[in-house]
Amino acid sequence: MDRIIAAVVAGVIALAPMAATAQDYGRYSDAAAQTELSRIADVRMAVMVPMRDGVGLATNVYRPKNAPGPLPTVFVRTPYNELANNARTTRTALTWISRGYAFVIQNERGRYFSGGDYQILGYPQTDGYDALTWIAAQPWSNGKVGTLGCSSSAEWQLALAAQNHPAHAAMVPQASGAGIGKVGRFQEQGNWYTGGVPRSLFFVWLYGVDNPLRAQIPVDIDQETRARLVRYNDLDAKKPEVNWPSQIRHLPVDQMLSDLGEPPATFEQLIARTPADPAWRQGGLYHDDMG
């Protein structure tokens, strides 16, 4: 971990581009922010970035117009619906573009317009690495990528940093609470177990996030059509409201979501694992044996 922290400090210095006058884009209306983004940025929406197994991940790329040369990049990966006309994404892109960075945001595998099947944290040991390789190879990139994000968008950065990708110049993992390892005599599994007891609050989150019945866009669709689909369509699941104070007491626990009509998905995989199951170390969570 000391190596990771040192890389953050050194990378932030190395990544820094030209200075720019700061703007408070939080004061802009949604319409004004979108207008300003159109004025100062070249935008490509839903670019399908290929992973090593051929699966494409939907990615928005924002670059300053008329940039004088290759740019450093700020990169966010997210499981949430932040690519399609998202006001927060627009303001974040403005913040970085106005300072001379490219800004790239990508949906994790199996989320919204990305291909493949969802796994919590989205295969950071392969997908995260491959995404950085793709960014660094673009003609507009100077080969330096800083990763940024909170919660899930922070946790994948730790597993990525342990791989020492040559383009990974800086990282800012905010509120990265999940990891795998031993705390005293207990095995910890990120958000799932604490001292061997499953965290029922995480079940509620998973019900809202996991969507195994999501629509998938044909992989051979052209880029322009895919971008229009992202702009004008919403793949968020519209699930029924649940009385969680009652449902959280459901027994047996492993049928808590199937009792709501949910098809088998991530919950059923994780609830079947014991705290010491070696499968915890095969996913994207940072663990004791990394780096």
Region roles according to the model:
Residues A19-A22:
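Boundary at the C-terminal end of the N-terminal hydrophobic targeting segment
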Residues A154-H165:
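Short glycine-enriched nucleophile-adjacent loop
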Residues S151-S152, A175:
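Catalytic nucleophile serine of serine hydrolases
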Residues A7-A16:
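Bacterial N-terminal signal peptides
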Residues P64-A136, F186:
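Cap/lid segment of the alpha/beta-hydrolase catalytic domain
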Residues Y28-G69:
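N-terminal cap/lid segment of alpha/beta-hydrolase-fold proteins
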Residues T90, S98, A162-N164, A170-M290:
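Accessory cap/linker subdomain of secreted extracellular hydrolases
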Residues P139-S151:
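Alpha/beta-hydrolase fold nucleophile elbow
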